Amino acid sequence: MRRAGVIVTLGVLLGVLGGAATTSPALADGRGDGWQFLTLPATFTVEPVFCGFEIDGTNLVNNGFVKALKTADGSMAFLTTGTDKVSLTNQANGKTLTANISGPFKTIVFPDGSVTFVTTGHQFNLLAPADAARFGLPGFSVSAGELTQAVAADGTITSLSMDGNVLVDLCAALS
C-alpha cells in the first residue's frame, strides 16, 4: 500500500515534469533563462487509499514554472515555483475547499533512482496510511514550511522531516 502511494505520487510528479520539459521556453513569460511553464492537468483524482474516499481536484490557478538542472554527480534537480491553487471536492458528501499549493519546491532525482523532495511554502502532502502513521502526519494535507522527504529507488520513504505546520488535514476537512 505504501509503495503504491509513493509510486502514484512519483508518477504524477515525473509526468508533470516530463510535460514541462516539452513545453516551449517562450511560454516561461519572462521568468528567466531555463524556466519553463509547468502545465498541470485541468482535473485530477486523489485515490481513496489516502483518505478512505475519492477526492476530485480542479486546478483553479496554474501559473507554475520549472527549471531542470544537472548536477556534477549526474543527478537531476528540478526547481519549481509560481502560483498554483486547487479546488478539492468529496463527491460523496459535496464538501469542497480550495488550497494554495504554490510551493516552491525542489526535487532531486539521483543516478541510483532515489529521490529527495524539499518543499517550502504551501504544498500538498500525500502519504499512504502506513507512512502517515509512521511519521505522525495526515494521509492528505496542506502544510507550510520546510518538508524534506527521501524516497528509495523502490518507492520506500526512507525519511521525512518537517520544520513547519500542517495547515489543513484534507481528509478530515472533506469527510
Located regions from the model:
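Bacterial N-terminal signal peptides that target proteins for export
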Residues: M1-T9
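Beta-strand-enriched cores of mature, soluble protein domains
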Residues: D29-S175
